[in-house]
Amino acid sequence: MTKIMHIADLHFGREDERLVEALAEKEQELRPDVVVASGDLTTFGRRREFAAARELFDRFDAPVVASPGNHDVPYANMFSRLVSPWRRFRRRMGDTITGSYADDDVAIESLETSRGAQWRLDWSLGKARPDQAREIAGRLESNSPQGQLKVVVCHHPLVAPGGMTGRAKTRFGEEAADIFIRGGAHLVLTGHMHQVFALSERHGDHVCWFVSASTAFSIRTRDEPAGFNLLTAEEDHFVMDIYVANEEGGFKQYERRHLTRKEAEIVPEHPGEPGI
């Protein structure tokens, strides 16, 4: 039974300090096997913002698998943004994070969907590389023993509730999603939208869930409060516990969903009063 703590869009530099502390406490309390961070650890890609992210992750007992987001490129240094957009991310985070992880029960790989620059006006939107997606799917398929959970983490959504429009307009996102579905991935964990959702796609008898988390603790909330997801893998389903920020500066479980691994459906369960 694997437990994954899924966080996204931390946006250090625009963080609620009370929620930073609360998240560290929740990691200790919930004791996940691994923490997955779906990008945007920082707001402007500044060194002090990366230092704050590293300080938080150093407090976690669980290993952290992270993929960079569009806010993790140097905002003010155009040369670095164009030539080496992720050098600061990798150098400043160091061995605090990893791009892949595997144990007897789960294998996790990261897909880079953020770009330092693009041939379109909105550089914040995502772009997946189908060739990288095929490489990742191949590694997961060839290196994963029977029964091992296969997980992909990236920043931008590959599928979205309203379709691939607006902020969800990830180039080649649907192609990458199809590659992962056919390659046997069980979970694709994303961020960027500051929105919680779980959508399923299937290939034959195989079901893949695309799960998005809200912003973990940024003051840059949109239509939903800050929060995170805890995903627990059971034999025939995933238990998705959604935590949201409350007025006291902590996190409270808001909803539990059962994501079936044999049929593409969600069975909701409300454990108590909302924490918002």
Name each model feature, range by range.
Residues 1-5, 100-110, 141, 145-149, ...:
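Beta-strand-turn-beta hairpins that frame and shape the catalytic cleft
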Residues 6-8, 35-40, 64-70, 112, ...:
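Active-site neighborhood of phospho(di)ester-bond hydrolases with catalytic His/Asp-centered motifs
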Residues 51-135, 179-181, 206, 230:
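Extended active-site neighborhood of metal-dependent phosphoesterases/phosphodiesterases
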Residues 13-15, 43-48, 70-78, 115-121, ...:
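Active-site environment of divalent metal-dependent phosphoester hydrolases
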